[in-house]
Amino acid sequence: MSNPSSPNPLRVGIGGPVGSGKTALCEMLCKRMRDNYDMAVITNDIYTKEDMEILLRADALPAERLMGVETGGCPHTAIREDASINLEAIARMSADFPDLDLILVESGGDNLAATFSPELSDLTIYVIDVAGGEKIPRKGGPGITRSDLLIINKTDLAPYVGANLDIMAQDAKRMRGERPFVFTNLRSGDGVETVIEYIRKQGLLDEKRKN
């Protein structure tokens, strides 16, 4: 966690492997938070703006509040080693919308070693999914062990892939210690309110609005 008490918009970095549900999470957060908070989203893709276009088609936010960044290389470079392209996008969004409360920064799909630079993200959320197998939490990696919040998505698929959610919970707790995790089914919305409450409280969103 960086400095959520800053007067600038809260920046929430959302990472995880390809297909884990990062864009679905962005969509759900936008649709459930946009009436109460001034929001924008920045998506990262290597050669396209596909994730931004998905959010646009889903009417997650107005087009001017969605920005797609083409990283042109390894996805984790743009969120860690050289975050300048994303920092520039945040600066542009903040200039266009001076009253922003919250900016979601979705990374391109990456491996378990991907992490956000502290200068880019105040809170980090890492999304994995049950379809990857119940062993995923115990594989570790910075995304699983050091993210502020771990999301284990697609719980509805557990019976079909032979994943035991109790074992995944035990492994997540062992790997993360006191850091929280939550099970979600983003298709149905299960668990989303828990994620929103975490962002609100840990990101001091309501305190920001008072100031």
Swiss-Prot record:
It is found in: Cytoplasm. One of its GO terms (biological process) is urea catabolic process. CDD domains: UreG. Keywords: Chaperone, Cytoplasm, GTP-binding, Nickel insertion, Nucleotide-binding. It comes from the Bacteria. GO terms for cellular component: cytoplasm. SUPFAM superfamilies: P-loop containing nucleoside triphosphate hydrolases (SSF52540). It holds the Pfam family cobW. Belongs to the SIMIBI class G3E GTPase family. UreG subfamily. Homodimer. UreD, UreF and UreG form a complex that acts as a GTP-hydrolysis-dependent molecular chaperone, activating the urease apoprotein by helping to assemble the nickel containing metallocenter of UreC. The UreE protein probably delivers the nickel. Facilitates the functional incorporation of the urease nickel metallocenter. This process requires GTP hydrolysis, probably effectuated by UreG. This is Urease accessory protein UreG. It comes from Janthinobacterium sp. (strain Marseille). The lineage of its organism: Bacteria, Pseudomonadati, Pseudomonadota, Betaproteobacteria, Burkholderiales. The gene is ureG.
